[in-house]
């Protein structure tokens, strides 16, 4: 089992650092899946038990100048590692304006992901800063629990408003209630609602648009104004919104009525799926 990779392009390095910061905000620990052409950051808490799930995917060729890996075997050419997200994020913070970044799987009395950052000093000579991030290698028999989540057909799929705006609305609502209802329809309308014994607050977003597939065949006989809704823990939604550092190129919200909400974001060449289950 081997893995080594190198980034020398400054824009790629900054983008990779931003992704790492986002993951650290979304998950305390995560699984890093390394395959020949992709990297995935995975969080697979069981939705049925009220946990959130995350699947973040990036094509390695869009980031790395060098990328070599050998999986656990020829037929299972993948590596699954568990790590503390904050440790990776902290290591990459030192990589701003770096000349190069190297990541390597090592064993220093315990398995590590070793991050080496080549920095230019004032005298133009370079110095290397190294971080050893402790990891756990996940055995093959547990991989089946770490596959891409199956997305059920949504009742409504809708484009999200500007995430910054949505975040500031949800932050205010969190001061009133821990629970939130997200509802949306096929007419481009999305509402965020909280209800307590004393107060009921709703924020309306209109003309957001629905992706083409959502309006065709399966929904032809549906009333486009009919709302699908899901009742969720507001803190889980806020954690997701707080993790978004940049407004994505595409942001979709898929609602499975009274079961779950699935957010599907595309940041340039990085996709992020995030699942929040309904409160039982």
UniProtKB/Swiss-Prot annotation:
Component of the 9-1-1 cell-cycle checkpoint response complex that plays a major role in DNA repair. The 9-1-1 complex is recruited to DNA lesion upon damage by the RAD17-replication factor C (RFC) clamp loader complex. Acts then as a sliding clamp platform on DNA for several proteins involved in long-patch base excision repair (LP-BER). SUPFAM superfamilies: DNA clamp (SSF55979). Belongs to the HUS1 family. It is found in: Nucleus; Cytoplasm, Cytosol. One of its GO terms (biological process) is double-strand break repair via homologous recombination. Component of the toroidal 9-1-1 (RAD9-RAD1-HUS1) complex, composed of RAD9A, RAD1 and HUS1. The 9-1-1 complex associates with LIG1, POLB, FEN1, RAD17, HDAC1, RPA1 and RPA2. The 9-1-1 complex associates with the RAD17-RFC complex. HUS1 interacts with POLB, HDAC1, FEN1, PCNA and RAD9B. HUS1 does not interact with RAD17. Interacts with DNAJC7. Ubiquitous. One of its GO terms (cellular component) is checkpoint clamp complex. InterPro entries: Cell_cycle_HUS1, DNA_clamp_sf, Hus1/Mec3. Signal peptide: none annotated. Its main location: nucleus. This is Checkpoint protein HUS1. Keywords: Cytoplasm, DNA damage, Nucleus. It comes from the Eukaryota.
């Amino acid at each position: 089992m081997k893995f080594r990779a190198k980034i020398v392009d400054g824009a790629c390095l900054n983008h990779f650092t931003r992704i790492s910061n986002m993951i650290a905000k979304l998950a305390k620990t995560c699984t890093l899946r390394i395959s020949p052409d992709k990297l995935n950051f995975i969080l697979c808490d069981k939705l049925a038990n009220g946990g959130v799930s995350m699947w973040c995917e990036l094509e390695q060729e869009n980031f790395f100048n060098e990328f070599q890996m050998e999986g656990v075997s020829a037929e299972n050419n993948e590596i699954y590692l568990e790590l503390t997200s904050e440790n990776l994020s902290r290591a990459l913070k030192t990589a701003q304006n770096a000349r190069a970044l190297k990541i390597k799987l090592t064993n220093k009395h315990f398995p590590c992901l070793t991050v080496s950052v080549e920095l230019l000093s004032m005298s133009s000579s370079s110095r290397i800063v190294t971080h050893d991030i402790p990891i756990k290698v996940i055995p093959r028999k547990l991989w089946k629990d770490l596959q891409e989540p199956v997305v059920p057909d949504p009742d409504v799929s809708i484009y999200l408003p500007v995430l910054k705006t949505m975040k500031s609305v949800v932050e205010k609502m969190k001061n009133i209630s821990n629970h939130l209802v997200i509802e949306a329809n096929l007419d481009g309308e999305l509402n965020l609602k909280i209800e307590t014994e004393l107060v009921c607050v709703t924020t309306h977003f209109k003309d957001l648009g629905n992706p083409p597939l959502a309006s065709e065949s399966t929904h032809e006989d549906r009333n486009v104004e009919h709302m699908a809704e899901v009742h969720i823990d507001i803190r889980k939604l806020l954690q997701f919104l707080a993790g978004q550092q940049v407004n994505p190129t595409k942001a979709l919200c898929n609602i499975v009525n009274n079961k779950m909400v699935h957010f599907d974001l595309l940041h340039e060449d990085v996709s992020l799926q995030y699942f929040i289950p309904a409160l039982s």
